[in-house]
Each structure stands twice: as structure tokens, then as C-alpha cells.
Regions:
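Short acidic/histidine-rich active-site segments
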Residues: 217-224, 286-288, 296-317, 422-428
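C-terminal cap of metal-dependent C-N hydrolases
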Residues: 427-484
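C-terminal helical cap
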Residues: 8-10, 106-113, 283-285, 326-342, ...
Length: 503
């Protein structure tokens, strides 16, 4: 039995296109679109009441393991900079995760996303106390709600050689599982934390793993100035140059944030290619600055970085902060962590207490392996390079909506299905809203309606793979109230374990 959606304002996002019409869905795919479509015997016919119908949204960078962090107690010491936010909050949370919390966080995170019209999650997971099989737990939690996922495990040197090896193996194991399944519902990338917690030999191993599975690397890039500063201080290289030298900069990769890249770094990303995940609400929350997204010519998508699953809110934030920055009101980003601090603290950040530091040389490892050494830092880039990027171009509403659609383009590559399109042959991941515009809605002004008319509160029903996962605001795939009650109990236990983790 298929479905026919009639009397709908069909809204494609990239490029913006609005048509009044109907869709027919069968076997998980859109099979017909037009002013009217013929139903077949047994089809369910749904009158959308003249409301907006959109493709399902894709969260380009998230951490569903943070779902149970909402309302958690403050850390014992107030963070004073980005590194302390990681050390005192998120690295304590991820170490406190057990199997129950991992699966439940994924399920709750997926439920929150579903209610916001998000149908696919590109997730970056970390649980150093429970690594083996962790991605199976995340996948189960997401699948129980009916969403699609592109998953990875965060490889890092923070927990010493054993933790690093376990992270790489979890990525390999899950990549093998996904390559065997190829069902369009789940896929994988190679996960990496960030340059400043990864030694050279690990970058080589990650690139080799990506080569083995013909995929990309999902990594945080220049979220805070400390990432670039650490790279220049320890390796005499610019951050993007280091990632490129070891093969992590590639068209299949996802570079999250890119908040502090200068003009030459942006040009290199544009030239070689990667998909940049822009997370404006997280960047504001962590006070790390504003990414020069207007300068990117490579694909850009929106992510929430674990702040829920509401991409409508993320799009609006992206527009507002771009306006703020265009007016020059953002000001310089202050950080108490300067390059010189890294030599003083050694591997204190890269390796948490009890973990061994590898202390590899930036060039010797590749030379010993018969490869050429990465090019060292040879010149200092102008301090105004990034500033000119921020001020030179203003984003338009159409560009913001293009970023909103960007996650679907990237997820389509990994999953092997067409997402983000209301057209024949595309996956039937569809959001039915109750938004009946009270002003004219056209292809030209659709971005304005998305930014200032639509919101997640207007999401009424959601199809994923042609199945109703949310119908008239009722979750169909699981007992939502029971899951929320379970989550409240599990969150208390998680928070107690966090309190026992040393900062």
C-alpha cells in the first residue's frame, strides 16, 4: 500500500522551488509528483490542507550521546575557555557513558530530531569507557525511532594507545558492517576528534582506514584557536596543511566547525574539497567565534553539534549571526589558551590522566615509512586574513537554506539513496507541516518563509522511507512516554557517574 499526499505546497530547498501539487509514495520511494497524481487501489490518501511539505532534513554534525545532558549539574569548576569546557564537561560526560546510556541517548536524540522534521543524523560518537560495540548501540537507538544515520566513533590519543586502538577498531568494525548491509538506512565515516588530540601516526592510520572503505573522515577542525595554535607550535604546520598532508582532507570528509581558518586554509579546503558542517548555535554557546562560511565554495551544511535536533532553529541562528558579523559587531574572540601554553602543558590535553603520550615527531614517522614529510610552516599568514573573510561577503537567505539542504546532499553520498528531494526516485523522507502561509509563498521568497515563518513547532507528520514515523504529532515507532520516563532515570545515574569522574 502506498500513500498519496494531496493539496500540498511542495517546497524543494536547493534550489528553492514551490509548487502546489501532490506526491505518490510506494515502497519507500517517491514515484509520482505533479499538480495531481493518480492513486492506486489500497493507497492511503492524505489531504495536506494547503500546508507546506518539505524533504526530510539532515543534521550534518551532531553528538546524540549528549541527549541526556539537558539540565545536568554544573561542573565542579567553571570553565574559563574552550579547552576547559571540554575537560570539565564533555570529556567527563563521554567517560561516564555506559551501554544503557549510549543506546538511550541515541533514542532520545532521535525522538527530538524526529519532532523537528530531521530524518537523518550524521553523528560523531564518543564513549571511552564503552568503545567496543558502541556504534551498534547508537544505530539501534536511532533505528528504533525510524531515522537514518551516518555514524562514526571519535578516535583520539586522549586515552593512550589502548583507547586509540579501540577507537580505530570500532570504526573499522562498523564500516565493515555497513559495507555489508548497504540498506540505505545506515552508513559510516571514519571518526576522529581533532588535530590537537591526534598524533601523526594516528592520522596515517585514519587515512588508511578511509582509503580501505572509500569513505571520508568526520573530524572537528579549528573549532577554537587552540587547534590551529597547537598545530603550528608542535608541528610547525598550519592545521589544514597537516590534515591534507596525511590525507584527511578529501571530498568525502566532513570538517565540523572550521571556525578559525584563514583565507589560505579556506582556499585549500575549497580546492581539494570536503563538506563543512556549520554549527552556529554551538559556536555561540562555546564563545569560540564565527566560521567564515561565506568564503567556502565547497559544500556547507548545518549541524547542531549536539544542541538538540532542531535545524529550523539552527538555520535562523545562522542567518542572525551572519547579520551580526556582517555589521562588525562580533569583535575578536578571546582565548586564554595561547600557543605557548601547549609547550607548558605538554600532552595534558591530548592524553588524560593515566594515558601514555606518544611524543611522535611531525616528520620522522612518514620519512621512516618511506613517504615524504609534510611541508613545515614556512610563512606567517596575515592576521587580517580571516577578518577579511568574515566581513567581505554577507550570506543571503537562499544560501542559508542551501546549507539547510546541504546535509541531505552529503548523507546521500554515504547512504546511496537520494535524500532532500521531492521528486520521483528520491527516498520518501518527507515532512508534512501545518504551516499554511498567510502571505504569498513563491520560489523566490521561500527562504524568507523558512527563516521567519516555519519552525519545528509546525512539524505535524514525518515519513521516513515511506513509513509514518510521526503522524499528527504522535510518534509511531516506539512508546515515547515510556522512553522519556526511562531517560529521566538513566540521566540521574549518568550524572552521578559524571560526578565521580575527575576533571
Amino acid at each position: 500500500m502506498g500513500q498519496v499526499l494531496t493539496n500540498a505546497l511542495l517546497c524543494d530547498l536547493d534550489p528553492p522551488r514551490v509548487e502546489t501539487g501532490a506526491l505518490r509514495i510506494d515502497a519507500g520511494r517517491i514515484v509520482g509528483r505533479g499538480p495531481t497524481v493518480a492513486s492506486q487501489p489500497g493507497d492511503e490518501v492524505v489531504d495536506c490542507g494547503g500546508a507546506v511539505v518539505l524533504p526530510g532534513l539532515v543534521n550534518g554534525h551532531t553528538h546524540v550521546y549528549s541527549a541526556l545532558a539537558v539540565g545536568m549539574p554544573p561542573p565542579p569548576k567553571a570553565p574559563q575557555n574552550f579547552l576547559e569546557i571540554l575537560k570539565f564537561v564533555w570529556w567527563r560526560l563521554d567517560r561516564a557513558l555506559d551501554a544503557e546510556a549510549i543506546e538511550l541517548s541515541a533514542r532520545i536524540g532521535a525522538l527530538e530530531a524526529l519532532r523537528c522534521g530531521t530524518t537523518t543524523l550524521i553523528d560523531h560518537h564518543a564513549s571511552p569507557s564503552c568503545i567496543k560495540g558502541a556504534l551498534d548501540l547508537v544505530q539501534k537507538g536511532i533505528a528504533d525511532v525510524g531515522l537514518r544515520g551516518v555514524l562514526c566513533y571519535e578516535t583520539t590519543d586522549r586515552h593512550g594507545p589502548d583507547g586509540r586502538a579501540a577507537g580505530i577498531e570500532e570504526n573499522r568494525r562498523f564500516l565493515e558492517r555497513c559495507s555489508n548491509a548497504r540498506d540505505g538506512r545506515i552508513s559510516a565515516l571514519v571518526g576522529a576528534h581533532a588535530s590537537f588530540t591526534l598524533e601523526d601516526e594516528v592520522l596515517e592510520q585514519l587515512a588508511t582506514l578511509a582509503d580501505d572503505f572509500d569513505t571520508g573522515v568526520h573530524i572537528h577542525v579549528a573549532e577554537d584557536p587552540c587547534d590551529e595554535e597547537d598545530c603550528q607550535h608542535r608541528y610547525q604546520m598550519f592545521l589544514v596543511d597537516r590534515l591534507a598532508a596525511y590525507g584527511l582532507l578529501r571530498p568525502e570528509s566532513v570538517f565540523a566547525h572550521c571556525t578559525h581558518l584563514d583565507g589560505l586554509a579556506v582556499a585549500k579546503v575549497n580546492q581539494i574539497g570536503a563538506t563543512v558542517a556549520h554549527n552556529p548555535r554551538s559556536n555561540m554557546n562555546n564563545a569560540v567565534g564565527y566560521a567564515p562560511v561565506a568564503a567556502f565554495r565547497c559544500p556547507v551544511m548545518l549541524g547542531t553539534d549536539g544542541i538538540g535536533g532542531d535545524l529550523f532553529a539552527e538555520a535562523k541562528a545562522a542567518w542572525l549571526i551572519s547579520r551580526h558579523e556582517q555589521a562588525g559587531l562580533g569583535g575578536p574572540v578571546e582565548t586564554s589558551t595561547r600557543a605557548a601554553d601547549f609547550s607548558a602543558r605538554g600532552d595534558a590535553v591530548r592524553s588524560e590522566p593515566g594515558a601514555a603520550a606518544t611524543g611522535l615527531d611531525a616528520r620522522a614517522g612518514r620519512e621512516a615509512a618511506g613517504g615524504s614529510a609534510p611541508s613545515p610552516l614556512t610563512s606567517v599568514r596575515g592576521s587580517d586574513a580571516r577578518g577579511s573573510l568574515v566581513a567581505s561577503d554577507a550570506l543571503t537567505p537562499t544560501q542559508i537554506v542551501g546549507m539547510l539542504a546541504g546535509g541531505a546532499r552529503r548523507a546521500s553520498q554515504s547512504l546511496g539513496v537520494t535524500l532532500g528531494k521531492l521528486e520521483a526516485g528520491a527516498a520518501a523522507d518527507i515532512v508534512v507541516t501545518d504551516y499554511v502561509p498567510f502571505t504569498p509563498l513563491t520560489s523566490e521568497n521561500l527562504p524568507g518563509h523558512i527563516l521567519f515563518g516555519l519552525s519545528s513547532n509546525r512539524v505535524r507528520s514525518v515519513l521516513v522511507d515511506g513509513q509514518w514515523r510521526l503522524r499528527d504529532r504522535i510518534v509511531r515507532a516506539c512508546d515515547e512516554q515510556a522512553e522519556r520516563a526511562h531517560a529521566r532515570e538513566a540521566a540521574q545515574r549518568l550524572w552521578q557517574r559524571m560526578a565521580e569522574v575527575p576533571a
